[in-house]
Curated annotation (Swiss-Prot):
One of its GO terms (cellular component) is nucleus. GO terms for molecular function: chromatin binding; DNA (cytosine-5-)-methyltransferase activity; DNA (cytosine-5-)-methyltransferase activity, acting on CpG substrates; DNA binding. Residues 742-874, 910-1049 form the BAH domain. It holds the Pfam family DNA_methylase. Belongs to the class I-like SAM-binding methyltransferase superfamily. C5-methyltransferase family. Residues 709-718 have a biased composition (Basic and acidic residues). It comes from Oryza sativa subsp. japonica. The keyword Repeat applies. This is DNA (cytosine-5)-methyltransferase 1A. PROSITE patterns: BAH, C5_MTASE_1, C5_MTASE_2, SAM_MT_C5. The keyword DNA-binding applies. SUPFAM superfamilies: S-adenosyl-L-methionine-dependent methyltransferases. Residues 1092-1526 form the SAM-dependent MTase C5-type domain. Expressed in roots and inflorescences. Expressed in roots, panicles, anthers, pistils, endosperm and imbibed embryos. Expressed in tissues containing actively replicating and dividing cells, such as shoot and root meristems.
Amino acid sequence: MAKSPRSVVTTGTKRRRAKVHKEDEPVENENLESEFDVSKKESNGATEPGNEPVASKRPKRAAACSNFKEKSLDLSEKDSIITIKESRVEEKEIEAVNLTRTGPEDGQPCRKIIDFILHDGDGNLQPFEMSEVDDIFITALIMPLDDDLEKDRGKGICCSGFGRIENWAISGYDEGAAVIWVSTETSDYKCVKPASSYRSYFEHFSEKARVCVEVYKKLARSVGGNPQVDLEELIAGVVRSINSNRSFNGTVTKDFVISSGEFIYKQLIGLDHTAGNDDEMLATLPVLVALKDECKSRAGFTHLPAMPSNGTLRIKDGQDKGLTEDEDAKLARLLQEEEEWKMMKQRGKRGTSQKNIYIKICETEIANDYPLPAYYKPYNQEMDEYIFDSDIGMYSDDVPVRILDNWALYNSDSRLISLELIPMKAGAENDIVVFGSGFMREDDGSCCSTAELAQLHSSSSKSGREDPGVPIYLSPIKEWVVEFGGSMICITIRTDVAWYKLRQPTKQYAPWCEPVLKTARLAVSIITLLKEQSRASKLSFAEVIKKVAEFDSRHPAFISSKAPTVERYVVVHGQIILQQFADFPDESVKRCAFITGLLAKMEESRHTKLAIKKKSQQMRGENLNPSAKMGPILRKKLMRATTTMLISKIWGEYYATYFPGDTKEEDQNEPKEIDDDQEENEDNDAEEEVNVQDEKATRTPPSTRSRKSSADTRKEIKWEGQTAGKTVSGEVLYKCVIVQDLSISVGATVTTEDDSGETIMCFVEYMYEKLDGKNMIHGIILQEGSQTVLGNAANDREVFLTNDCLEFEASDIKELVTVNIQSLPWGHKYRKENSEAKRIEKAKAEERKRKGLPVEYICKSLYWPEKGGFFSLPYDKIGNGTGICSSCERKPVGNEFKLLSESSFVFENITYNIHDFLYIRPEFFSQGEGHETYKAGRNVGLKPYAVCHLLSVHGPAGSRKANPESTKVKVRRFYRPDDISSTKAYSSDIREVYYSEDIISVPVVMIEGKCEVRLKDDLPNSDLPAVVEHVFCCEYLYDPANGALKQLPPNVRLVTLTRKVPASKKNKGKQICDIELGGSDKPKDGQSENCLATLDIFAGCGGLSEGLQRSGLSLTKWAIEYEEPAGDAFGENHPEAAVFVENCNVILKAIMDKCGDSDDCISTSEAAERAAKLSEDKIKNLPVPGEVEFINGGPPCQGFSGMNRFNQSPWSKVQCEMILAFLSFAEYFRPRFFLLENVRNFVSFNKGQTFRLTLASLLEMGYQVRFGILEAGAYGVAQSRKRAFIWAAAPGETLPEWPEPMHVFASPELKITLPDGKFYAAVKSTAAGAPFRSITVRDTIGDLPAVENGAGKPTIQYGSGPVSWFQKKIRSDMASLNDHISKEMNELNLIRCKHIPKRPGCDWHDLPDEKVKLSTGQMVDLIPWCLPNTAKRHNQWKGLYGRLDWEGNFPTSVTDPQPMGKVGMCFHPEQDRIITVRECARSQGFPDSYRFAGNIQNKHRQIGNAVPPPLAYALGRKLKQAIDAKR
C-alpha cells in the first residue's frame, strides 16, 4: 500500500536530538516534526531559521562474515557462469532517495526498504525500538514504494549507514495488516523485508505491531469490533486470530499479548484523534486499560540480565541529565524484552519427535471404515478454551491436563472427522486442521478408559454425571497419543492450551471414534501376541497378519477372518499401531520384524511423508474453530458482581496498587492456616500422628511494658494546669505536660521508642509524677493497619488501639501525632452522609500529602489479635486521665493455682469445691494405649473426658508450695457406655454416665473443667440439633470388675441437684449450666418478633438458616439462591421465607433501583436488564434497608476450595467475585449482624488478599469484626468439615464468642497466622479430649433399612426403631423415610464394590489382582490400572473405592460421591452400594424431616454445599446469648 500521512497510524516516541558525534558545537532541534504532520518539511533539506544543518558521523558498516567453509563441487561449464545483477550503491541517502523517485511527490518522500538492518554507530545490530534510546542507523536496499519486491530489485539503491532514525510508526489498522515505517530527516521508509541476519531482531517488533492491529480489530466498531468485551475474551480472540500461523504454543502467545499490553495501549490511544463518531475513546476503554494494568502487574515476572548481545555496556556522557534515568530504564526494558523474546522462540522451537519423517494416513483409504459424512452442531453455550488458559508461566513448556467428556472432532467446515488424520507426533507438517468441542472439567485423577466409556454408560447410568463440566470449543489439535495398560485404552489430545483426556464421545461422534479404538485394541493384541513368543522378531509381518485373521469373532480386536482384509486394515491404520509400538518399553518389541514389515508396506502404498521440523509449519490465514463464529448472544456470558460504590472503590483501589506476590513484606503479613492441607486432603489429618497430649499454646498476652529511660535531660519539662487526682498507689495525676514547646494532653497521641529503638505510637491514657519526681506517661500502643492481620489491605491512615501499654518518661516523647478518634453515626440512613464525610476527609489528606504536611490518622477500632478480631473503641473509658487504663483492665486474669482451703481451690480461673462434678483428661486413664488410624476411621480410639465427683482435696505434705502437680484430689469416677463397649455406647444416650465405687487420686493439673450429673428424669427434654450443655444423667451403677450394671441404689444422692449455680459463676468456663427446661430454642408462635429478621444469600437448600433458626436467634424472611432445585428445597423447608431463585447480582440491582439508589450501584447491563424484567410481585417482596437485621450466607466456594482444582477458570474467578456482591448487600442494608461462611481455604486463597479485603471492607463500613475456623465434627456431626467464619456486628452490639466444641474429634488446632509470628485459633482442638465422644457412622445411619445399588424409591418405611441417641434426635417424629436413594454404579464398579472386604479401612488396595468378565463378554482388571502406577504421587490413593467404618466418621461431604472421586470413601460399611442421599444428609446433621429437591445429583449437590445445621445452631446460640446479655 502507498503510505498516506493521513491514514490511521500510531507512532513511536519522538527522540530528543543528541549531540553530534562529528562536531563539537551543539545543534538544537527541539521541535522534531512527526512524519505524519499535515505540514511536511520539503525534501530539499532546508532547515528552520536558527538551526544549522546536522552533520552526522558516518557509522561503521555492520560486521560481515569473514569465515566461509569451503566445499568442492563439480560444476558444468554452463553452471559455472553466473550473471551478476548488482544494485547501485550510493553514499548519501538524499541521492538514493532522488534516484528511486518515480514521479512528483508532495511532502516527505516515501520509499520501501528491503534487506535492511538497523545498527548503532559502531555497526552493532540493535533492536528496532532502540532508536528511542540511541542513535540508530539503517543499511538497506532503498526501492520505490510501488515497485515489485523481487522483479525490480535492480531499481534499488544500496545505501549504508544512513539516517539516523528519527521516529517510527505503525499503519494498516483499517486494512487489518500491520505496516511498519521508519523515518529519517530525508524520507519515510516502509519496512518490507529485513536482512536474514536482522530477521530475529525485527521479528519481535513486527509481532508486537501485528498484535496492536489485531487488538484494534477486536475493539474498534469501525472495523467490526466490540469495545465492550472483557479482558479474557479480548486476549482469547487475539490469540486465536494470530495463532493459526504461529510456531509456538498458546500459553506463550497469551503471555506475549499481555507482556505487550503497555506497548499496545500507547499505540492505540494515538488513534483517538482519528476516531469516528461511533467509536469509543480507546484511552479510557476499560478493557484496554485493564490490559495495560495486567502488563504492569507482570513487570518483574522475570529478571533477565539487561545486557546487549555483544556484552558491552555503553554509558553516554554529556546528554541532558533530565532524560538519563528515563532512557536507562527504557534501555533496560528493551534489552530484557529482547532476551525474553529469544527465550520464547527457543521454547517454541523445541520439538518432541525423534525422527524426521511421519507417514501420513490417507483419508481415502480409511473412508470405508467410517460412517457417511455428518456435521457437528455446536451447543449454544460453548466457550473459547483460550478463556481458560491456565497462566502457568511465561516460559513454561507445561500445560495442564484436563478431561473432555461428551466430545466430537470436526474440520473448519464442521464436518465430523477422524483423529487419524492428525499427526501423532508434535512438529509434523499437516494440511488439515482439526477442531473439537466437548465438556471440560478438572482432571479428577480417574483412569476411565476411552474405550470403556465409548461402550458403557457412565458411573451413574440413569442420569449421568451431576457436573458435566464447561462446554468449550478447542483451538486446533496439535497432536494426540494413545495410552494403554491392561484392558484400558485412553486417548489424549493436545491443543495450545492443555492436554485433554478423552472420555465418552457424543452419540453422534461415537462411530468416528470406534475405528481408532479398534485399531488401538488391535495394536495391544499384536503386542501381546509377540510377547508370548520366545523372541519378538520370531513372527514376520505376514505371520502376524495370519494369526490376527485367526482371532475369534468375539475377540475385541477381531477385524476379519480373511488375511488380505486384515492386512489392508493394518496398513491403512498403521500409524496408530506404530505409535503404540514406539511407546512400548520393550526394545525388542519396538524393533521387531512386524514393525519393519509394516513400515515397508506403508511406503509401498505411497503414503504421504510429512517432514517433522523443530517448529511446525505455519498455517496460512485464520483457521478458526467454526464454533467461534457463533454470535455473542448464543455464547455463555459471565455476569460480573453487582457492587455498591464503596465496595467497588475499596477493592478497585487495592488491586490498582497491589498485585499477588509483589513483595516479601506483603507475604509476611499474609494470613494463612498453620494446617494448610488442601481441602481435598481434609481427612488426611488422621494420617499424621494425633498428639493427644495437651497442647498449651504459647501466646503473647497483652502486656504493660516499661521502657528503660533514655530521657534527654536537656529537655524542658513541666506540668501544666491543676492536679487531677491520684493513682491507686498515691502518685499525683495531671492532664497536660509541656515538653520543650510541645503541649501534650491526656487523649493525645505521641511517638516514642521502645528498648529496641523501634518507633512506637502511643495514645496518652494518663500522666503522673512518680514519687522520685519523674514525669511519667502511661500510653496505649497504637498499631498501623499494615501491622495487623489486614496487612496491605488496611487504610494507610487508620491506626488501631491495642491492649498493649507502655510507660515512659515524658522526656522520651519524640513528636506529637494527630490521631482523630472517630465515631460516625451508624445505620443505612447515614450511608451517603458518611460517604461524603470520608470523601472530604480523604481529599484533605491528599492535599496535606501534596503539601508535605504530616499525616493525620484516624482511629475507630480496637485490634485484639488474641480474640481474632476488631472491636469498637471503649469511648467512655479511654483518655479520661483517671489513672485507670481500660487496656490494663482487659488483660486476662492470671491462671495461677490457689488452694483456698481443705475443701476448695482455684485452677485456671475456675473455683472447685467438694461435691462438684468435674472433667479429668482421658490420658490419665489411658496412658500407653494406642490405636490404628486410617482414612475416615481416625476418631477410633479417641476418648472424651472422664466425669468424676470431687470428694476431697489434699495439698502437698510439709512446707512444699502447693501447685497443680503436687496438689491431688480424690474423686469418684463415673464410667461412660463407651468404656464398656461400642455396642453399649451405640444404644445409650450420649449424655449417660454410670456411678461406680472407684475412688482414685488425681493431680489437679489433670482437671479440665466442671460439669453436672443429674438423674435421667431431671434432664431437659431437648430436641436441639446439638448438645451444648455440660450436663450428664445417671441411673445405673457400674462394677468394672465384673462388668455388671445395676440400678442406682436409692441411698446414692447426686449432691449438686440440690445446689443452684451462683449467678456470679455463670458464663465462666465449663461450669456453664444455664439449662433451659423448655427444650428447643426454636422460636415458637408469638415469639418470632424477638428474632432477627434475616436475609440468607447464597442460601442453598438452607442448612445455615435451619441451624440459626433452631437456635431461636433468627427468622429467615428472605432468601436468594441461583440454582432452582436448591431454591425449591429452601422454600419447602422454610415456607415463611420469600425465596428469590435468581442471580444475587440481579436482586441487588433491583433492590437499589427500587429504593432510588441506582446512582450508587455498579452493575452489568445484563443485571440491569434482568432486574427490570422482574415481576411486580417479586419487586414488592424484595427487602429494603431498615427491614433486614441479619445477613448471612456463604459465597460460592468453588474458587476458594482446594477440592475444586479447576479454580482458576473465569467462572471460578467470577464466583470469587461474588464476595463483592455479598459485601455490597451488607454495605447497602447495614444490618445489625453479618455472618460469612466459607471453606477454610478462604483464609489463604489468593495469598490472603480476599480474606484481608473482606475484613477491611467490613471495618470501613464501621462494623466490629472477628474471624475463625471451626471443625464441624466437634459440634455433633460424624463428618470432618472445616469452615471459615467471619462475624460482623454493628457499633454498640456485642460480637458473639465462638461456640465451645463439645465432641472429641481428631482435628488439629485450626490456626490463622498473624503478623510478628503470632497466631489465632478460634477454639482448641478436641483431639486430646472433650465433654462428649465423637458421633460415629453407626450412630448416624445404623438404623436405616438396607437398599440396593441404584435404589430410587423416594419414600419407604424405616422398618425398625431408632437405636442411638443421634438417631432418636434426627428422626424426631417422622413415620416414613424420604430420599433413601442411591446413585447407580456401572457394572464394573459394582463388581469392584462387591470385592471390597466389609471391614474397617478397606479400599482399592484390598481388591484381588485378577480379571473379571462383564456381561458384554469383555475381560477387565478389577484393580483400576492407573492407580498402582500413580499411587506414589497421590498418597497411595487412600480411600478410593473405600468402605466407611461403623466406628469411624464420614469424610468431607461432597457434591458427587463416587468411588474414584477426590473423596472416594463412599461405600456403605456392609452393603454393596454408594451411600444414599439421606445418609449424606444425616452426616451433615440434617433432620430426617428435611426435604431436598430435584434429581439425585441435585440433592447430593445441595447437601454437599450446605453448612451442617448443628454447627449453625451452635453459632446462632452464641449470638443469641450475646444479644440476651445486652438486653
